[in-house]
């Protein structure tokens, strides 16, 4: 503690309060040796570090696949992960044509207004899905947004069965999105890849083609992450 106090130039009493708070959160651990407290990193901090490193690896492995998907569809492509029961976008590939409404990297959205979000929770264990649907309050962004947990559950069953999610203006009027799951080597869904576009280009005639290309991209990404069906 004295070393931390000297290096950070803050009083020992403040250091002690900070360390005890971090200890309660399991980010550090205390080991008394010969009557002196020795502090080291806790398991939760190590888990957090591993989680961030795995996301960095994911972005690196999937980036070329995202670029190819964006080129094939001429649409905006995103990569999202589940974080705090919401979808958090960790990467994207933009096209030259403008898209007025989209989620930036680092932003988080409720799962009911995001195709990626629906994909990420559709494959959760039953008890985890039950908890999420009972605890979350789902916003109604547009008249097309589904907010009822029972209706969402039915939609999620369809997502699981068909292997993709379709957001038809649930996030914003005039915006459509198709997402598919990325699996890791254990068979768990670790991310979702999606194509987003406006009604002007994301027409009804192109939906079937987009579904096929997004699912193909997700399958390629899953193989890169070690998944073998």
What does each model-identified segment do?
Residues 34, 40-135:
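Amphipathic alpha-helical effector-binding/dimerization core
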């Amino acid at each position: 503690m004295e070393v931390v106090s000297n290096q950070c130039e803050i009083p020992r009493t403040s250091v002690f309060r900070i360390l005890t708070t971090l200890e309660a959160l399991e980010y550090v651990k205390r080991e008394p040796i010969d009557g002196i407290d020795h502090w080291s990193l806790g398991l939760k901090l190590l888990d957090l570090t591993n989680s961030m490193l795995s996301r960095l690896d994911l972005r690196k492995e999937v980036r070329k696949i995202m670029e190819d998907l964006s080129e094939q569809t001429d649409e905006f492509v995103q990569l999202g992960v589940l974080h705090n029961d919401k979808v958090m976008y960790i990467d994207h590939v933009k096209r030259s044509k403008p898209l007025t409404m989209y989620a930036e990297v680092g932003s988080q959205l409720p799962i009911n207004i995001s195709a990626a979000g629906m994909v990420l929770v559709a494959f959760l264990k039953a008890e985890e899905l039950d908890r999420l649907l009972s605890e979350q309050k789902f916003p109604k962004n547009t008249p097309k947004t589904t907010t009822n947990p029972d209706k969402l559950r039915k939609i999620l069953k369809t997502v699981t069965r068909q292997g993709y999610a379709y957001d038809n203006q649930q996030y914003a009027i005039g915006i459509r999105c198709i997402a598919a799951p990325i699996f890791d080597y254990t068979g768990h869904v670790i991310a979702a890849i999606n194509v987003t576009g406006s009604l002007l280009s994301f027409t009804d005639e192109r939906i079937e083609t987009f579904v096929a290309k997004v699912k193909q991209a997700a399958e390629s990404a899953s193989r890169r992450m070690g998944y073998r069906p």
